[in-house]
Amino acid sequence: MTGLFITLEGPEGAGKSTNREYLAERLREQGVDVVLTREPGGTPLAERIRELLLDPSDEPMAADTELLLVFAARAQHLQQVIRPALAKGCVVLCDRFTDATYAYQGGGRGLSIERIAQLEQFVQGELRPDLTLIFDLPVEVGLARAAARGRLDRFEQEGRGFFEAVRQAYLQRAVQAPQHYRVLDAGQTLAQVQADIDALLPSLLEACRG
């Protein structure tokens, strides 16, 4: 069985984590070996970096610092989890990856896309996701869902303009490379979103079986 790298992306409150679990369950029902992971994080060291990135109580973080911490966590994650799992033929389902960097640090923070691309090449080499699922929904809906979860992290405390830029950056990437992306309407009911995921299963299983 061929290793497959699938990332799940979207703004706050889009339901990525819930739907990642659902997709993993559906793949495992078909005998697929699935590794679930997330960014920032995925290893003990990368999770410590995640805490720095999300903690709203720390000193104000410069945008460049944020970008470099994201890629530092990613480098560790790739070496310790993602590359070994793909080499074993697993399907890796990752909650956020480099598209999130282009969306949040590029779109939201306004950092240079060229700089992000340079770091992407340095850290990842030629490794890119085989498929990215973007869970899209109106910003106000996502922020309301995030607020309902309780205490907001450092990113969730950003204003609406930030998240509008994040959303548009995601959608622009999907337009630029439609063969690598599927945009799902995360504003639907959970059952409807999962029906859309089910519709993708045959092609995913075919790719897994090479």
Curated annotation (Swiss-Prot):
GO biological process, alphabetically ordered: dTDP biosynthetic process; dTTP biosynthetic process; dUDP biosynthetic process
Keyword ATP-binding in record: yes
Keywords: ATP-binding, Kinase, Nucleotide biosynthesis, Nucleotide-binding, Transferase
Catalysed conversion reaction: dTMP + ATP = dTDP + ADP
DNA-binding listed as a keyword: no
Molecular-function annotations in GO: ATP binding; dTMP kinase activity
Superkingdom classification of source: Bacteria
SUPFAM superfamilies: P-loop containing nucleoside triphosphate hydrolases
GO cellular component: cytosol
InterPro entries, per the entry: P-loop_NTPase, Thymidylate_kin-like_dom, Thymidylate_kinase
Pfam families xref list: Thymidylate_kin
EC numbers, comma separated: 2.7.4.9
Residues that, per the record, bind ATP: 10-17
Enzyme class label: transferase
Function: Phosphorylation of dTMP to form dTDP in both de novo and salvage pathways of dTTP synthesis.
Family statement drawn from the similarity comment of this UniProt entry: Belongs to the thymidylate kinase family.
PANTHER family: THYMIDYLATE KINASE (PTHR10344), UMP-CMP KINASE 2, MITOCHONDRIAL (PTHR10344:SF4)
Protein name: Thymidylate kinase
